[in-house]
Each structure stands twice: as structure tokens, then as C-alpha cells.
């Protein structure tokens, strides 16, 4: 299977007079492909969260069992992000990403026909493992086509894909329920999003690009020599493209203190984010006494409110903080803590929704 994901041969060289136009077009296509692809991963991930009230009602699962299912998927996803991203270094980004989407879709079809708890557990673990195939190709594609001075804004644009994807899950599933009815809740919750994900996987294959060299263009360093970064390496060390995934990890990740700082911060960011996403439906329905329609609106606001703030954060980190990402992250984490207290203590529908949106923003 891994051999099918390997990078293909380089395309014929683009004529010199067409290089600039082709480069501009290809890099926009490459960015659009990973935007749409990563968006689709969230369609076949967050749909599980929206199905949790029905897991309680229709399959009689307890809150503890639902929490265990969510934890299994997220732990598998966390492990997979590291492993799959390493494998993606040696694969075709577009094929790797599309393959992961199709596998997630297949797992969701399985969820649409399952009723036993342990079958659900096995399938959500598989879904978590395949979900990890989305982030690596995205980072690789952005690094291949965009110089460092643009990556704050480009990364911010790409990052809103998961908010768009998470935000459109509720309308997709809601429309499926309207058409199929609540008696077909599994089809509406799992099979319909799976079909949508397959359509997006096809778009990734059509739009996606390899590195500039693989597309017959000069490398990024040749196109933008002012952005060329000379890596200081130890004597005799091999170039990254000739190193194994394990060697790259040991050299550029394990010994990189900045990578550890970012990982440490990310632990707490994801703790809040996935804690909110995983429990928001049940919490709002059972504790805050929202209706299912009101809960869906709050879920949508949590995701979509992050879109403008993410773009603003990318611009601020590039312009105001001169490329330093950590100060803004610390400010946002402090504000998140304050807003979580408001989310917890508020009783009115409006204020709970507002604090939900602000946490999503940050």
C-alpha cells in the first residue's frame, strides 16, 4: 500500500517563459487542495460529536461510554498525527491526503451500520488513526510552495479549513436528518458525511500538487532566492531529503527545543478545544437545557467564529509580533481561561452561545 503512495516521477520542465504564471497558478491550486482536504477531514470527525445525543437515546450508551469513545478516537488521532506525518514526508501529499479521506469515509460507513459498543470503539480508533493522514500533507505542501515570510498568513488561511469543516457538519447532518428522518439517524450522522468526504477526496487528487520540482518548476529557493535558508548541519550529515523518517525526527524534532515548546502549549489548547467539541452537545442539552436546534447553532458558532480571528492572528503574528507566534498564543490562552468560566457560569441561552463563540475565536 505504501508503494502506491510514493511520489511519482517529475513532470516535464515548464518552458522558461511560462514559469512565473505556472508557479503562481500551481501554488494556489496546491493551497486550495489542502484547504478542501483538511476541511473534509473535520466533516468525518466532528459528525461523531453531533451523533452523541443519539448514541445515548437510541443505543442506550452512558456518558462514560461516550466519553471513552471520544477519548479513544482523540488518543489514536494524536499518535497518528506524528506517525502519519513522518510517512507523508516520503509520499505524494495529494495521494496521501486523499487516501486518508477515503479510509475515514469507509470507517464512517461502518459506523452507520454498527450498534455494539465495542464495534463502535474499534471503528472510532480506526477513524482517529486515518484522521492523522491530513495534517502532514498540508504542512508539506505549504512548505513546498510558500516562503517563510508568507507562512503566517498562508498558515492562518489553511487553519480556518478545520473551522469551516467543523462548522458545516451541523448543516450537512441537519439537512440529512430533514430528508431521511430521525429513524435513519445513523445514515444522516455517518453515511452522508462519508459521501461528502469522498467528493472532497476527488477534488484533492484533481487540484493537488507535489513539490515545484515534481511539477517541472524550479524549487522554492530558486524561485525566491531571498528566502533561501541555509541549514547549519553537522559535518557529514545527510540532507533531509536523503534521510529516513526516524533520522529526520531525531535530528530536526527531538533536539529542537522550539518544537517542544509548541507541543507543550498545544497540549493545553487541544485539551480545551476537543473538550469543548466532544462534550458541547451533551452538556448543552442536559445541563444548560438547550434544544437540539439551539445546540447545533452553538456548535456552528464555536467553529465559524474562529474564522475571522484565525486570519487576524496570522496577520498579527506576522506584522505586530514580527513572526514570533508564542506571545499571541499566551495572550489567547489567558483569555480562553476567562471565557471558560463565563461559559460554565452563564445561564442564559445568549450568553452561553456568546462565550462558546469567543472560546472558538481564541
Summary of predicted features, one role per range:
Residues 123-162:
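Cytoplasmic helix-loop-helix junction between adjacent transmembrane helices
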Residues 90-101, 319-333:
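Cytoplasmic membrane-interface "Motif A"-like loop-to-helix N-cap segments
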Residues 60, 92, 113-118, 289, ...:
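Helix-breaking motifs and short loop linkers at transmembrane-helix boundaries and internal kinks
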Residues 158-212:
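Helix-loop-helix hairpin linking two adjacent transmembrane segments in secondary transporters
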Residues 323-362:
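C-terminal transmembrane helical hairpin of 12-TM major facilitator-type secondary transporters
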Residues 81-92, 310-323:
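Helix-to-loop junctions at the C-terminal end of transmembrane segments
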Residues 48-52, 252-311:
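Extracytoplasmic gate region of multi-pass secondary transporters
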Residues 79-117:
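Conserved MFS/SLC helix-loop-helix module at the cytosolic interface between two early adjacent transmembrane helices
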Amino acid at each position: 500500500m505504501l508503494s502506491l503512495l510514493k511520489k511519482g516521477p517529475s513532470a516535464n520542465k515548464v518552458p522558461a517563459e511560462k514559469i512565473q504564471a505556472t508557479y503562481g497558478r500551481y501554488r494556489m491550486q496546491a493551497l486550495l487542495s489542502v484547504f478542501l482536504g483538511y476541511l473534509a477531514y473535520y466533516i468525518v470527525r466532528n459528525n461523531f460529536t453531533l451523533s452523541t445525543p443519539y448514541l445515548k437515546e437510541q443505543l442506550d450508551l452512558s456518558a462514560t461510554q461516550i466519553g471513552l469513545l471520544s477519548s479513544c478516537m482523540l488518543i489514536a488521532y494524536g499518535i497518528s498525527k506524528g506517525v502519519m506525518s513522518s510517512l507523508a514526508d516520503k509520499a505524494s501529499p495529494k495521494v496521501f491526503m486523499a487516501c486518508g479521506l477515503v479510509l475515514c469515509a469507509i470507517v464512517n460507513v461502518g459506523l452507520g451500520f454498527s450498534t455494539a459498543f465495542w464495534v463502535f470503539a474499534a471503528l472510532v480508533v480506526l477513524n482517529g488513526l486515518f484522521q492523522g493522514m491530513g495534517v502532514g500533507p498540508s504542512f508539506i505542501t505549504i512548505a513546498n510552495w510558500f516562503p517563510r515570510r508568507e507562512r503566517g498568513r498562508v498558515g492562518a488561511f489553511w487553519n480556518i479549513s478545520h473551522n469551516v469543516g467543523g462548522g458545516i457538519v451541523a448543516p450537512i447532518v441537519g439537512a440529512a436528518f430533514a430528508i431521511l428522518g430521525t429513524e435513519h439517524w445513523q445514515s444522516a450522522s455517518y453515511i452522508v458525511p462519508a459521501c461528502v468526504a469522498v467528493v472532497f477526496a476527488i477534488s484533492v487528487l484533481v487540484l493537488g500538487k507535489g513539490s515545484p520540482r515534481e511539477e517541472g518548476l524550479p524549487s522554492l529557493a530558486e524561485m525566491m532566492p531571498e528566502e533561501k535558508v541555509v541549514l547549519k548541519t553537522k559535518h557529514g550529515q545527510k540532507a533531509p531529503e536523503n534521510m529516513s523518517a526516524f533520522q529526520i525526527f531525531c535530528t530536526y524534532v527531538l533536539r529542537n527545543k522550539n518544537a517542544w515548546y509548541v507541543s507543550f502549549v498545544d497540549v493545553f489548547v487541544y485539551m480545551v478545544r476537543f473538550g469543548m467539541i466532544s462534550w458541547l452537545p451533551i452538556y448543552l442539552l442536559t445541563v444548560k437545557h438547550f434544544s437540539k436546534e439551539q445546540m447545533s447553532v452553538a456548535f456552528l458558532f464555536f467553529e465559524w467564529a474562529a474564522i475571522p480571528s484565525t486570519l487576524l492572528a496570522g496577520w498579527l503574528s506576522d506584522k505586530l509580533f514580527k513572526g514570533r507566534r508564542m506571545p499571541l498564543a499566551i495572550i489567547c490562552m489567558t483569555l480562553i481561561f476567562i471565557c471558560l468560566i463565563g461559559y460554565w457560569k452563564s445561564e442564559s441561552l445568549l450568553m452561553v452561545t456568546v462565550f462558546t463563540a469567543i472560546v472558538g475565536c481564541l
